[in-house]
Structure formats: C-alpha cells, structure tokens
From Swiss-Prot:
It comes from the Viruses. Residues 13-23, 31-56 have a biased composition (Polar residues). This is Non-structural protein 4. Transmembrane segments: none annotated. Coiled coil: none annotated. Residues 719-732 have a biased composition (Acidic residues). Signal peptide: none annotated. Residues 13-74, 706-732 are annotated as: Disordered.
C-alpha cells in the first residue's frame, strides 16, 4: 500500500491532468504493491505491464518506455479526490482555555494524581529496603560499605541471603537485587553495576536515598497492574469528565502517546524537561540508575527504561506526570521512530491530563489569572498544517486546497477516494498526537466535512462539556492572540443539563445575538453602526462596526455594570423558554451560558485620550458644545482612515482583546416552580381509609360483584365430589 501511496503523491505534481474524474480502478499491480518490474521479473524485457481493471475487468497494457510516468498519469486521471474541511461544532469548541501552569489547574492535577497513587504506591524510604546478597558477595564489599549494613540506627541498611528472603514477609518491602537472576519479588529494584558498582560508592545509603526520590514504586499487591493501569485509574476518577462511550478509546489514546514518548527517548536519546523545573529531566535509563523490575506473567521480567535526572519537586503537576510516565511498562519499541516530535507528544499528555483533572476538581472553572483566549483561525491553520505537512500523508496523496461556504474561503485538504479510509484513520491518530498545541487555541475535537457539507468523519477527544467550558468566576479581559481575518467575533457557550438539547442551544445563541444587537445599539451616538450575523461555517457570530473603540468600551461597560448583561440574558432565555416550551421539559434542570467577545480595536488609546480632552474642555468652557459634538461625530468614523493606513503596514495601532463573561447558571426547576408550572411542595390529601383498608375494601367489592354474577366459586375437590354424586344418582 505504501508503494501505491507513492504513486498517488507523485501524481499531484502534474497540473495538466484532470483531478476529479471517477476511477474505474488502478492496475492490480499498483493496488497490491507488487508490479512485475518491482519484483525484478523478466517482464521488464517484455516491455509490457498488465493490470486488471477492478470494476470492469478490462486489461490495461503499457509499453516500457516511461512506464512509471504512464502509470502515474493514469492514477492522476482516474482517482477521484475528496475535499475535507475542518469544522468545529459547538460541543468541541472552547471559547476560553487555561494557561500552562495555571495555579488552579496545577492544584487540581496534583490532587487527582495523588488520589491515583493512593494505596497503589509505596513510601520509598530506606527503612523499607532489604538487599539480597550471598555471604560471599557481602564479604567482598569494602569495610566502609559493610558498616552501613551492620551498624545500629535508623540509617542502617538491611540485607539477607536469598534462602532467607524466600520465606520472609515482604509486604511493603522493596528487595534490591544485584542482578536479574534468581527470584523476582513483587517489588524488586535492580542495583546498577552489581556488587562491583556498590563497592565503588562512598555511601550506599546516600546513593539509595537519592535514587528512591526519583522513582515511583508500586505496592506488592499492585505490582505490574499498577504500572499498566495508573492511566486507567485516572480515567475512573475523572469518568464524569469523559463521554462514557469514548472512555476505552481515549484511555488507549493516552497510553499510546506515552508509549510513543518512551520510544522516542529510548531510541533517539532525547529528553523531556519539566516546564517549571528545567533541572528535572526525564531521560533514558543510565548505567548508574536503579531500575524497577516486575514479573509479567510467570517468567518475563520487565525493567523500567527511563529515569529522572533529579528528584521531582513536590506540588508540581508537570513533575508528577513525568513520574507516572517513568513507571509505565516498557514495550518493545518499533523500528520506526515516531514522526511526532517529543515535545509535542508530552504537551498533548500534559494538556489532556490537566483538562481531565480540571474538570473533576474545578468543574471547568478557574481563577481569572489562569484564563487564556482561544482562536478559531489559529486552531484551523495549525490543524491543516499538521495534516498537509505530514510526509506519510503527502505520499498517500493528501494535499492542501481551499473550499468555499458562500463567499467565504476556508482551508481544506484533498484525500484520494480509494485511500480515504486509511488516510482518515491516520489523520485521527496524527491530530490527537498534536492535541496539546491545538488545545491551547480552543480545540477539543473536530469534524471533517466533505464537499457536500456533510459531517463525514469525527475526531473525538472523549472530553465532555466540563472540559470544554473553561471560565472564571468573574468577568475578565485578556489579550486575543489571533490569525483571524474577522475583526470582531461574538462566541457563545451554552449547555443544558443533564440532557443536551442542541435545538435549545441553537435558540439560545440566536436569541442572545438579537438581544445583544438591541442592547448595544441602545444609547449609541449618531453615526456609529453595529450589526451581528452568524458565521457561515460554525456557531460563532461576527459583528461589524465603524467605530471599534466605541463598541469595545460599550461592551466592556455592559459586562462591568452587570445589570445590562443580566437583562440581555434574561430576555434571551425567556424567549427561548417560551418558544421551546422548556418549562415542561423535565429532562433539562440547568441551563449554563457564557460569552466571549473578541475584538481588534483600532486607535483605542487615541480615542480615549480624545474623549478625556474633550470632556475637560467642555467642562471648563474652552470648547463650545457644538464643536465637541462635531468632534465626537468625527471620532465615530475615525476607524476607516486608520484601517486604510494599517492595511499597508503592520497594525501597530490595533489591540486585540477578548472579553470573557462569567458562566451564568439558571436553575430551571426554580424557574418552573416560581411560574407555577409545578408546586414547590406536594399537597397531602387525607383519606378516610388507610392504604391497607382501601385495598381490603376493593377486594371485598370485587368478590361481591363476581359472586353475584357467577355464583359462589367451587374448589376442584367440590366439583369432583359433585360429579360423582351425580353419576351415582343416574345409576340408581
């Protein structure tokens, strides 16, 4: 199949061949990857390459001169190319996200991972260590080393001969062996260098103490199960933050990313440093490092292949994640080094674990200092670049292009139809390996739309709404890092709990758009325009204005004063509830709404300065009122001249801001109660008969009715006796 991919990739270079014709089937030799020429057979001398048409059975003959080029041309001519455009539905998009190292997120990760390790990890201290040595090995050690085993006190080391260890109680003990020969105990450490390595040390106790600080040792009861399942336990703790049907898939995803990290480190000798503590480095296991050894089955011993350069720092989530990566089981590495760079893989693991833990501990809300804006355009650009720049995908025929929704051009990519299945699966793996750098811009999954606009392929992270709604408990203004061609964006994040109602969410978005337009226009001075319209390809809204400073200050004031924003939400939600008849939808108990307003504000400093000067001059009487009003009117259109200049040079006079609201929570049960749809308290009706008395009355009434209509009931014995009596009477 790789050879086929090579032909398809080459075929894209010839621009003179039509690309979108239906394919009747490439030659069989190409599909199987086994042309006679490539097998070194005598067909090269014959000069004919035969292939069977997969649909019609027609035989294709090609002459030897330029045979490979002819095959490529046929491939270009016949293979239909599909166009895929990334689309971010509401449930996969964050209107804000968290910074790496945000304090709230750090605490949530530490809390969760400590919970993961609880009752599964041993307390690594020298008092829990016992060395396995023969008498000969012990006596061969220098006196200074032997003294550490024979002295009395807390810093004394323990040792025993193999025969004594087999019958000893080793619960919560770590056995240090000088080699992998002999018995492997539930918790076993392999001392580097064996007996000779120990003899070279100045202090075995000090060496052991420093080494134990760098490893995570599973308890004997957990043994191998711990090192293979810490990620599973993490998923169990964070199950509320995951889409249940996706748990198994994303569990494997996280494990595969970590195994890719291990392979990259062990095969290429790369390292990962903690983001917060660069001196703490995860590297390949060295000759001077203690290794954990555990039994896999009955005979196979697995050794840790990674080591930390220094002790991890307490309270650091990044160090904690490095510890857990260190103790995953070793797997036989593939011959091929992973194509995704190591730093990108670790960023994906770090962000994925952080997102789950944040949802579990913080319910998706963090302090204002940890908030970061997202950007749809940047995420889309990075996503497309990841796909079209992958060498293997390019060799399979993937190439960049553009698609249009109305008049809007969007980034897209070509996929050969005959390889679409395998290509889309590889894209899925590739995109998820880049989860970290994409998540920092708002990505939480994506849908690939085909040229007809249908959602053809879903790339799902498995994270649910608790991790796709990241907001503070206060209004916040942050820098908007963007590559968008849109100057002004209005993003809404709404969710209904416990049942998701896409219809209701869409109605909420549209109602908020209408109310925002109404409230912002109210009170604007003459000459300032403002209009909102939905973006063609996603759930965002764009808005246009001829005075971005005036609108920005108006919107910021609306959030700051809170009451106008409250009125906006109340009016919008009341319309939705009436239209959707949500008052009687018992499946929805809570509605949550948050908004992000993203703007490129041109000339804000000059605008504010002008307003301050004008206000002072008007108050002092030095500037006539009519002149002041004229200046204000001119300021409304000041943006147009500013933009004309800035389009030629870099926009040094523009600042990109993102205003993020609090998450507003509406209790629908309380709304229903207040509106009289349901009673706040159940009214108890006192009956003259108790429950048992009423049941007895019904039974008696039923017996009376049936007895009156059908006579008294007779038992089977009575009926037999009556029949016998009747028979005797007839005989007489």
């Amino acid at each position: 199949m790789k050879q086929v991919a090579g032909f398809i990739g080459m075929s894209q270079k010839n621009k003179g061949i039509q690309q979108n014709q239906w394919h009747s089937g490439p030659p069989q030799g190409l599909l199987s990857g086994q042309t006679k020429a490539e097998q070194g057979t005598s067909s090269q001398q014959a000069g004919v390459n035969q292939g069977e048409n997969s649909k019609s059975g027609a035989v294709v003959q090609r002459k030897m001169p330029m045979r490979r080029d002819v095959n490529s041309a046929a491939q270009r001519q016949h293979v239909r190319r599909l166009v895929y455009t990334p689309y971010f539905p509401n449930e996969t998009w964050n209107i804000s996200t968290f910074k790496n190292g945000a304090k709230d997120v750090e605490r949530s990760v530490i809390s969760t991972l400590n919970n993961v390790a609880e009752n599964r990890v041993m307390d690594n201290c020298t008092s829990r260590v016992i060395f396995e040595m023969t008498q000969i090995q012990f006596e061969s050690l220098p006196d200074i080393i032997r003294n550490e085993f024979t002295r009395v006190g807390d810093d004394a080391l323990k040792w025993a001969v193999p025969e004594d260890l087999k019958s000893a109680d080793l619960d919560h003990m770590m056995v240090v062996k000088l080699s992998t020969e002999g018995t492997i105990y539930p918790t076993t450490l392999i001392f580097p260098g064996g007996c000779s390595g120990m003899a070279k040390l100045k202090s075995v106790y000090s060496f052991l103490e420093s080494q134990l600080e760098r490893i995570v040792t599973p308890t004997p009861s957990v043994s191998l199960k711990y090192v293979t399942s810490w990620a599973e336990h993490l998923f169990d703790l964070c199950s509320g933050q995951l889409i249940n049907s996706q748990n198994e898939r994303v569990d494997k995803l996280l494990g595969y990313m970590i195994w890719d990290i291990e392979k990259a480190i062990t095969l290429t000798d790369q390292v990962i440093a903690c983001y917060n503590h660069p001196e703490v480095v995860l590297r390949r296991l060295g000759a001077s490092d203690i290794a954990c050894a555990v039994l896999a089955g009955e005979s196979v011993v697995k050794l840790t292949r990674l080591a930390l350069s220094k002790s991890p720092v307490d309270g650091c989530s990044c160090c904690r994640i490095l510890e857990l990566i260190l103790n995953l089981p070793s797997r036989k590495p593939n011959d091929k080094v992973p194509q995704v760079p190591l730093d990108i893989l670790f960023a994906s693991v770090y962000r994925y674990v952080s997102a789950m833990c944040m949802g579990r501990v913080l319910n998706g809300r963090i302090d204002a200092s940890g908030i970061q804006s997202t950007d749809h355009a940047t995420a889309s650009i990075k996503l497309n670049d990841i796909i079209v720049n992958d060498l293997e995908l390019r060799s399979m025929g993937v190439d960049k292009t553009s698609s249009f929704r109305g008049t809007q051009s969007m980034r897209a990519f070509y996929v050969p139809e005959n390889l679409a299945g395998s290509i889309l699966d590889r894209i899925n793996v590739l995109v998820m390996r880049h989860f970290g750098i994409l998540h920092m811009w708002g990505f939480n999954g994506v849908v690939l739309q085909n040229q007809e606009g249908y959602c053809d392929y879903h790339i799902i992270t498995g994270l649910n709404h608790l991790t796709t709604i990241t907001h503070t408990n206060s209004m916040v203004a942050v820098h908007w890092g963007t590559e968008s061609r849109m100057d002004n964006i209005f993003e809404i994040k709404a969710r209904t709990l416990p049942t998701a109602s896409e219809t209701m969410i869409t109605l909420i978005e549209n109602a908020l758009k209408e109310q925002l337009t109404s409230i912002v226009k109210d009170g604007l001075r003459k000459g300032v325009s403002f209009s909102v319209k939905r973006n063609i390809n996603d759930s965002r809204f764009g808005f246009e204005t001829n005075s971005s400073p005036a609108i920005f200050l108006k919107l910021r004031d609306m959030l700051k004063r809170a009451k106008p924003f409250s009125d906006l939400l109340s009016l919008a939600l009341s319309k939705v509830i009436k239209k959707e008849n949500a008052m009687i939808q018992r499946s929805i108990t809570t509605v949550e709404v948050a908004v992000a307003i993203k703007m490129k504000v041109y000339g804000l400093d000059e605008y504010v300065s002008l307003m301050k000067v004008e206000k002072k001059e008007v108050e002092s009487g030095s500037l006539p009122l009519q002149e002041f009003l004229k200046l204000k009117s001119n300021a409304a259109g000041a943006q147009s001249s500013t933009v004309a200049v800035k389009m030629k040079e870099e926009e040094v006079n523009s600042k990109a801001y993102c205003l993020i609201s609090e998450t507003i929570v509406v209790n629908m049960d309380a709304v229903r109660s207040a509106c009289g749809v349901v009673q706040s308290e159940n009214l108890v009706i006192k009956s003259e008969l108790s429950g048992p008395e009423l049941s007895e009355s019904v039974t008696s009434g039923l017996m009376e009715l049936l007895g009156r209509n059908a006579g008294p009931s007779k038992s089977w014995a009575d009926q037999v006796e009556e029949a016998e009596n009747e028979e005797e009477k007839q005989k007489e």
